[in-house]
Amino acid sequence: MNVPKARLLKVAELSAKIFDQNFNPSGIRTGSKILNERLKGPSVASYYGNPDILKFRHLKTLYPDIEFVDLEEQYRLSMVEAKKRRGKGAPKKMKKDAAATAKGKGKKKK
């Protein structure tokens, strides 16, 4: 029971119309897969939060005469201090002369 290729293509085309799919018999890259996906714009925009909400640093710039207390910043600084006391803090920066000799750019030996 051989069915002509033209009839199979017609059936595939009708099936694509019924199920709202793209009919691409030649297999050309059309980008329809990407165009049919949901748009990512709203989810990306909502990831960064509402830009209209005032943040703490904005309050400090709007009202410089009022001394606000940033609890999150105080907590961060206390944790940094605790790490330093335990020897887990950031290393001290090298001085300019020490950095030059460490890289071999100091005085040259004859």
Curated annotation (Swiss-Prot):
Pfam families: MRP-S33 (PF08293). InterPro entries: Ribosomal_mS33 (IPR013219). It is found in: Mitochondrion. Keywords: Mitochondrion, Ribonucleoprotein, Ribosomal protein. It comes from the Eukaryota. GO terms for molecular function: structural constituent of ribosome. GO terms for cellular component: mitochondrial inner membrane; mitochondrial small ribosomal subunit; mitochondrion. Residues 84-110 are annotated as: Disordered. Residues 84-95 have a biased composition (Basic residues). Its main location: mitochondrion. GO terms for biological process: mitochondrial translation. Belongs to the mitochondrion-specific ribosomal protein mS33 family. Component of the mitochondrial ribosome (mitoribosome), a dedicated translation machinery responsible for the synthesis of mitochondrial genome-encoded proteins, including at least some of the essential transmembrane subunits of the mitochondrial respiratory chain. The mitoribosomes are attached to the mitochondrial inner membrane and translation products are cotranslationally integrated into the membrane. Component of the mitochondrial small ribosomal subunit (mt-SSU). Mature yeast 74S mitochondrial ribosomes consist of a small (37S) and a large (54S) subunit. The 37S small subunit contains a 15S ribosomal RNA (15S mt-rRNA) and 34 different proteins. The 54S large subunit contains a 21S rRNA (21S mt-rRNA) and 46 different proteins. This is Small ribosomal subunit protein mS33.
